[in-house]
Design a protein with these regions (language model features):
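N-terminal alpha-helical targeting/anchoring segments
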Residues: 1-146, 164
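TRNA-recognition modules of translation machinery and tRNA-sensing kinases, especially anticodon-binding
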Residues: 141-452, 457-459
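Low-complexity, intrinsically disordered short segments enriched for Gly/Pro and polybasic residues
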Residues: 70-72, 82, 452-461
Length: 461
């Protein structure tokens, strides 16, 4: 949510934000009209209240004196004397008009609040102009795509052939766009989750959180996933709860309605959760297999920071996500997203795009965003710089660290072998009992040794 004062005083800046995102500014224009109408109504109500208070005072004096009190000359064109009963009747009419206007005012304020939720964040000056993926800017690349001496297969073929992911039996349980991880596949999935959580907590200093996967409507409004994307959510109608589309929805509300102390910032959290999105997508390589599912696993990073540090913290968050790609040996291109490709909450965002040799595509396993104070205003998360100082809104940042199913798919495609097996990345072997390869008989193991007491098992190769 943007500051209403900013919208009111700098509407052209907000219009430009809509234009940069390739969106119609109709919600802004409607909001400005509603704001003007609200202020007109407030002024009329206050004028009538003042009139009512003044005349009520006159009536009090009149009753106390037992007679009439002078009426201001020329008011309503009437005579100078006004009987008490007539004055009381007039005030009843004024009171009725105030009630009528207050009802209209409440409706206008509700409409203003609804429209304010449709205003996206203002893109940062460094965010490229554009509305399509082709207009994103590649800022750097890491790793060399592997050269195969055979035709690489897409992950869904490899996984089914190895019997480590079962789409058909998942469909028996829940319908299309679900999967069952089995055997070595379930082990690899769990290894990825534990590896990512360990990396972000032990090396990057995040605090692990395990939030609910159900959230109230106001929580998803605060994170920005409602109202725009309500059709994409799994909704429990009986109690108006939603299955979270990402842990960001929960973590953004962790300090809702709190005033934090500056010395506690930044607050950094990481959470693994299943995520649920009822996305509608067309058939194609970018939606097959594990790429777009109604339920998927994700490790999410989230930060509450001071405004002056948020852009630096975005680069740090991005580096934490890139570290996962690098340790797993997955080549990627880093895209700085153009304005039209960002979420409504983001002012600046990066997508590290992993190479999928079997699919023949670069696809993101993560998206890292700086939302400035847009989410914090919705969630009312503030901080004080010092004792007695006026509270300010924090800035919030989020990033996948990473999406587990997509990372699983990227590993399967990048580490596939000609015989149909998949080599396990070295960094994951200690999480898989020392397994170095997934073949058609499951995991193949190597000798595991403990180098030092208390260390994570390492694998001989």
């Amino acid at each position: 949510m943007l500051d209403l004062h900013l919208i009111r005083t700098q509407p052209e800046l907000v219009r430009q934000a809509f234009a940069r995102r390739g969106q119609d500014s109709a919600p802004l224009e409607a909001l400005l009209r509603a704001d003007e109408r609200r202020r007109e109504l407030l002024q009329e109500v206050e004028t009538l209240r003042a009139e009512r208070n003044r005349v009520s005072e006159e009536i009090g004096k009149l009753k106390k004196s037992g007679g009439d009190v002078p009426r201001p000359e020329g008011r309503d064109g009437g005579p100078q004397g006004l009987a008490t009963a007539e004055m009381v009747a007039e005030m009843r009419r004024v009171g009725d008009r105030i009630k009528e206007l207050e009802q209209i005012l409440r409706a206008v304020e509700a409409e203003q609040e609804r429209l304010a939720l449709e205003i996206p964040n203002i893109p940062d000056a460094s965010t490229p102009v554009g509305t399509t993926e082709e207009e994103n800017v590649i800022v750097r690349e890491w790793g060399e795509p592997r050269k195969f001496d055979f035709e690489p297969k897409p992950h869904w073929e490899i996984a089914v052939n190895l019997d480590i992911v079962d789409f058909e039996r998942a469909a028996k349980i829940a319908g299309a766009n679900f999967e069952v991880f089995k055997g070595a596949g379930a082990l690899l999935r769990r290894a990825l989750i534990n590896f990512m959580l360990d990396l972000h907590t032990r090396e990057h200093g995040y605090t692990e959180a395990a939030p609910p996967v159900l959230a109230r409507r106001d929580s998803l409004i605060a994170s920005g996933h409602l109202p725009k994307f309500e059709e994409d959510q799994f909704h429990v109608r009986e109690n108006d709860m939603f299955l979270i589309p990402t842990a960001e929805s929960a973590l953004a509300n962790l300090h809702r309605d709190e005033i934090l102390e500056a010395e506690t910032l930044p607050l950094t959290y990481v959470a693994y959760t299943p995520c649920f999105r009822y996305e509608k997508f067309s058939a194609g390589k970018e939606s097959r297999g594990l790429i777009r599912q109604f339920q998927f696993d994700k490790v999410e990073m989230f930060k509450f920071v001071t405004p002056e540090t948020s852009m630096h913290e975005l680069e740090s968050l991005l580096g934490n996500a890139e570290r996962v790609y690098q340790l797993l040996g997955i080549p990627y291109k880093l895209a700085l997203l153009c304005a039209g490709e960002m979420s409504v909450a983001a002012a600046k965002a990066y997508d590290p795009m992993a190479w999928f040799p079997g699919t023949g595509k670069w696809m993101e396993l993560s998206s890292c965003s700086n939302c400035l104070d847009w989410q914090a205003r919705r969630a009312n998360v503030r901080f004080r710089r010092e004792r007695g100082a006026k509270p300010e809104f924090v800035h919030t940042l989020n990033g996948s660290g990473l999406a587990v199913g997509r990372t699983f798919a990227a590993i399967i495609e990048n580490y596939q072998q000609e015989d149909g097996s998949v080599t396990v990345p070295e960094v994951l072997r200690g999480y898989m009992g020392g397994a170095s390869k997934i073949g058609d008989q499951g995991c193949e193991y190597v000798i595991v040794r403990e180098d030092t007491a208390g260390s994570r098992p390492k694998c001989d190769t």
